[in-house]
Curated annotation (Swiss-Prot):
The keyword Transmembrane applies. The gene is pimE. Disruption phenotype: Deletion of the gene leads to a striking defect in phosphatidylinositol mannoside (PIM) biosynthesis. Deletion mutant is defective in AcPIM6 synthesis, and accumulates the tetramannosyl PIM, AcPIM4. Loss of the gene leads to changes in cell wall hydrophobicity and plasma membrane organization, but it has no effect on cell growth or viability, or the biosynthesis of other intracellular and cell wall glycans. Deletion of the gene does not cause growth defects under optimal growth conditions, but makes the cell envelope vulnerable to toxic compounds such as copper and antibiotics. It is found in: Cell membrane. The chain crosses the membrane at residues 31-51, 96-116, 160-180, 188-208, 214-234, 276-296, 306-326, 328-348, 351-371, 384-404. This is Polyprenol-phosphate-mannose-dependent alpha-(1-2)-phosphatidylinositol pentamannoside mannosyltransferase. Changing D70A: No change in activity. GO terms for molecular function: GDP-Man:Man3GlcNAc2-PP-Dol alpha-1,2-mannosyltransferase activity; phosphatidylinositol alpha-mannosyltransferase activity. Keywords: Cell membrane, Lipid biosynthesis, Lipid metabolism, Membrane, Phospholipid biosynthesis, Phospholipid metabolism, Transferase, Transmembrane, Transmembrane helix. Belongs to the glycosyltransferase 87 family. InterPro entries: GT87. Catalyzes the alpha-1,2 addition of a mannose residue from polyprenol-phosphate-mannose (PPM) to a monoacyl phosphatidylinositol tetramannoside (AcPIM4) to generate a monoacyl phosphatidylinositol pentamannoside (AcPIM5).
Length: 410
């Protein structure tokens, strides 16, 4: 046909009967509830149907240590060795943890283990939801289900389930402390978390950087209150922990195993002996501290609350003498922040986010553990030693990217 002297193109018939194509992300979100249920059932099946699916050794320590409170002077003499003959596991936590866990020893262990697993899943979902809230994405419940379903199979969560660890609950407590503006609630949550396990105390750096002085003071007061309660309940054992055992990394576990993803662990594997806090370890910590400070400033500190606590937590993980893979639960909110947060549109964010996801789903430190004859042997071939820096190097890359990505985008 001609219109004003021009020949128009033929227009084909428009199909109005076929439904529009649904994006893959939307299809996944529709399936989110089912995928979450399948993931949970698969995890429970792994625990109960696969030989050695989970040994709950740390949960045994929690329960056994709590039970030891009934025997005077026995808390820090207690060890669990039924499934770990090469390393009898002592109770390495503050005495307040034994008081908190005390009711657990009144129940059959099988019941405790099942409830514990459900609690881990609920806490993981809580971590995801609070992370979303901190990014202003609280309406995305189905996305939260997907992250929970996927997170169950990342290495930090796999080892949490295997050992029956408590770290997911502690991460949730710190995130809730960051998300609330109530100074007393922030202080209460951080203080209690640090009273159960010392590692959450690093969150105090976030509140110092955010100049939330009341929260800092309250968290310190609550922590010392847990010490006081412990002193009243277990007396000499509390004194023994805080004057003799605190800081004894050898008592916590083998420094050189690939599961220890801290600077001290990584440098020790390269040197072939425990590096302690020697020059190389201090240099590594110093470099990380500088990158963390630059990253903190780049995101405006506590203006990005999730980004801020992630920067602090990454620094704390490599600073600690021992950071087992189950300590790295912080990688779940980190991946969410990289892929959905305020910097997600910048070049490199998706590479880091998907890169962390690949590392944690593969479980690189776990794979490397098969190449070490025992957990106590520190020395190993150079390529395995350097490969054992995987989380540390990825942390440096992440902090460096946060520190300089905005400049690069400008």
């Amino acid at each position: 046909m001609r219109v004003n002297g021009y020949r128009g193109a033929k227009v084909g018939a428009v199909d109005t009967t076929s439904p529009p194509e649904v994006p893959a992300s939307a299809r996944l979100q529709r399936l989110a509830p089912m995928l979450l249920v399948v993931s949970i059932l698969a995890r429970l099946a792994w625990t109960y149907l696969v030989p050695n699916g989970a040994n709950f050794v740390d949960l045994h320590v929690y329960v056994g240590g709590a039970d030891a409170l009934d025997g005077p002077g026995a808390l820090y003499d207690y060890v669990y060795a039924d499934q770990t003959p090469d390393f009898p596991l002592p109770f390495t936590y503050p005495p307040f943890a034994a008081i908190v866990f005390y009711p657990l020893h009144l129940l059959p262990f099988g019941v405790v283990a099942f409830i514990w697993q459900i609690g881990i899943i609920a806490a993981l979902y809580g971590v995801v939801r609070v992370s979303q809230r901190l990014m202003g994405l609280q309406s995305q419940r189905r996305v939260a289900m997907l992250w929970t379903a996927l997170g169950i199979w990342t290495e930090p969560l796999r080892s949490t389930f295997d050992y029956g660890q408590v770290n997911v609950v502690l991460v949730l407590a710190v995130l809730c402390a960051v998300s609330t503006t109530r100074w007393w609630l922030s202080g209460l949550l951080v203080g209690l978390a640090a009273g159960i396990k010392l590692t959450p105390a690093v969150a105090g750096l976030y509140f110092l950087g955010a100049r939330r002085w009341a929260a800092v003071a309250c968290s310190a007061a609550v922590f010392f209150a847990t010490v006081g309660v412990s002193w009243l309940v277990v007396g000499a054992q509390a004194r023994r922990y805080f004057t003799e055992l605190l800081g004894d990394a050898d008592r916590i576990g083998p420094i050189g195993t690939s599961f220890n993803q801290s600077w001290r662990g990584g440098i020790s594997r390269i040197l072939g002996h425990d590096a302690g806090f020697g020059p190389l370890v201090l240099i590594g910590i110093g470099i990380t501290a500088v990158l963390a400070l630059l990253a903190w400033r780049a995101i405006g500190g506590a203006q990005d609350r999730l980004g801020g606590i992630l920067v602090v937590s990454l620094f704390g993980l490599v600073l600690s003498p021992i950071s087992w893979t189950h300590h790295w639960v912080w990688l779940i909110p980190l991946m969410m922040w990289l892929l959905h947060g305020p910097l997600s549109a910048l070049r490199g964010a998706r590479i880091l986010g998907w890169g962390w996801l690949a590392l944690t789903l593969l479980g690189v430190p776990w794979l490397l553990s098969f190449a070490q004859p025992t957990i106590w042997e520190i020395g190993r071939p150079w390529y395995l030693a350097w490969a054992g820096l995987v989380y540390i190097v990825a942390t440096l890359a992440t902090l460096g990217w946060i520190a300089f990505s905005r400049k690069g985008s400008g």
